[in-house]
């Protein structure tokens, strides 16, 4: 297929140059590429081709460092204008950028000129284009963007070699034909001419990739589909523009000349790396315009300062009207404008200063925590920042610390206050020198003659006032001796009335005396001891005992001072040790003694240790370092408690004897000992009793036996001969008038206590039983029956004893009255027992009505007692003599 074009001469020249002058080298990734080219290159000449994908596959931006060369996406290198190479090599770089991955690669291209001589013999490696068969593929065609026509506009023609043998019909497909944008291109099927129907915007379509087809009438395709690339040539139809209409930058004031302020960026939609997108920047106007403080680099758009005199206090904001123009800034290039705002950052370049050169104020003496003066300052730096916030200092005149100055955060004023009382009698005025600086460091301190601190003078006048007594010094120390006796006087606290410069008329009182050691003389302030001073008291800290004293004048004004009594140590305490130690036989056979002396070190160790003679048989004591001793067994002792008398003497000979309890135990550590507690065991003494002690024990035992024997003899029971009461009844029938209602009984339930009388003796026996009231007992001897009847009313106990040696008697001697005295308590007891319930508990207190015989009550019924089943233990009445059976029948329920 032959290529037909509108300009066959120019196409032929390009093919010749391409075949003779161009050398294309496919190189390794991102390495140098060497190309040999003719010394004279025309515009739009293909120089060579590099492999871009091997260096960076996803390159979104391809540009050349030399504007004389243009790089296509496939790696082809074209010249943008006529170029003449000297004999030396010429090099440039191809930059590949990936915006998403933020990667950038560089390919170095080196061009070397060669002579225009045709080689005698062409080798395959020297051939720029190898052609084994005539191909029907044309070179890429191009169309001008925004072309004005006329339309349809011829693009190019394709022809197939098969047209010599067949009737060929041509067709195309792809974007612009049967894809968006539709119907932009079409082809004449008979001739193969391709036409464009309308103008094209390159910013939408940079190129079109079409496919051409050659087929016969019957559909046979003698050729493969032909790729057709139609490139849209860029037209400078887009003016550059700033991404932001207004851009804001900041820069510190007083910065050096050449300081970078910021970089402006403009965008041009035309084809990159061409004159259409070669932009130039410049400043059209500065507001305010005098003096000129800024400049811009025309190619990079970086704005820098031109002077070091940017002063925020004069102007804090500048505006720059910027212009960006393409075509390398040529007047015919397209341009646009934007606004840049530059704000100056504040620096501490202005020190604060007082509004007045000096100040005068006054304050009453003895006043504290009062504000006496406020001082204002002025600062031109930015308000409410560390560059303008003031810090005040008192430089001179405050040696005693009477004043303090601070900053009011709301007004930035200096507030002068009195924190310690001033004395008019000592000084009537105070002159202070006050300085002020900023919180931030002054920025011009090293390069400027401006002072960083402003100072002023403050005169403080002190006003006299009638003040109270002064306790000076606040703490007074006096010396005393440990063990100082009671009733002695010590020098006390003295206060002063500053108005009269003496302590006359002042009265003193105690405010604090923890252990009440002293009393104070209210007129002189001297102390008098109430107790012996003891340095070892818990109220003494570091050998000092504190007393608070208040001095009061005539009108009630007062001051308070502290009197410290320093006690010098006196050797009044002997060394002390623990009362009990433990020796573990499984670990060691000794115990370590560590005495403690409450006195000071000068009255303490070294100590001396002595054993009593009675303990030397089993024990031995060894001194170690004057502070401790070792108590050791002479031989293994039994597991028990032992008492060991030990004497300990301090360095001045004060000695104390201690009875040390030593616990000898079968253990490894004292905490493992399981011997019973000391309070429940016997301590084995090591002291032998003397003869006088033994004699005293014997005499005491004899005396105790004598006392017990005497008490036994005195309290022995006497034997009283028993006798029988006379009885005049002599078994005669007694008229009891049973047919009548009987005698009136005023108390049915006769309760204890009851009185008894002994028939044989006129003496009465009354005993007391604990918790049961009075116990009464009656005894009757019945000669004939041979029994004695005892009635024990307090505890309810009844006994019947045989009377030994009594076998005779006259039964008629018993009188009726005596038997009545016997039966009346017994009947009362029976009635009392009938008043109990089935569990033998006492019944509730209630009145029981008893009817007369024959008036509704059953025979033999006496009320609540008729239902009882037990015989109350009266079986002994069955063995009485006949004369007692009548009484027994009366007592026993049938």
From Swiss-Prot:
Q: Which InterPro entries match?
A: Cadherin-domain_protein (IPR050971), Cadherin-like_dom (IPR002126), Cadherin-like_sf (IPR015919), Cadherin_CS (IPR020894), Cadherin_pro_dom (IPR014868), Catenin-bd_sf (IPR027397), Desmosomal_cadherin (IPR009122)
Kindly list every residue the record annotates as glycosylated. Answer: 165, 546
Q: Which UniProt keywords apply?
A: Calcium, Cell adhesion, Cell junction, Cell membrane, Cleavage on pair of basic residues, Glycoprotein, Membrane, Metal-binding, Phosphoprotein, Repeat, Signal, Transmembrane, Transmembrane helix
Q: Which residues carry this modification: Phosphothreonine?
A: 385
Q: Which SUPFAM superfamilies match?
A: Cadherin-like (SSF49313)
Q: Where are the transmembrane segments?
A: 692-714
Query: Where, in residue ranges, is this chain on the Cytoplasmic side?
Result: 715-894
Q: Which residues lie on this side of the membrane: Extracellular?
A: 135-691
Query: Which Pfam families does UniProt cross-reference here?
Result: Cadherin (PF00028), Cadherin_pro (PF08758)
Major subcellular site: membrane
Source superkingdom: Eukaryota
Q: What residues does the annotated propeptide cover? A: 30-134
Pinpoint the Cadherin domain residues: 135-242, 243-354, 355-471, 472-575, 576-682
Cross-referenced SMART domains:
CA (SM00112), Cadherin_pro (SM01055)
List the GO biological process terms. cell-cell adhesion; desmosome maintenance; establishment of skin barrier; hair follicle morphogenesis; homophilic cell adhesion via plasma membrane adhesion molecules; negative regulation of epithelial cell proliferation
MF (Gene Ontology): calcium ion binding
Self-association and partners: Binds to JUP/plakoglobin.
Function in brief? A component of desmosome cell-cell junctions which are required for positive regulation of cellular adhesion. Required for desmosome adhesion strength between the granular layers of the epidermis, as a result moderates epidermal proliferation and differentiation. Is therefore required to maintain postnatal epidermal barrier function and normal hair follicle morphology into adulthood.
Domain comment, as recorded: Calcium may be bound by the cadherin-like repeats.
Query: What's the protein name?
Result: Desmocollin-1
Q: Which organism is it from?
A: Homo sapiens (Human)
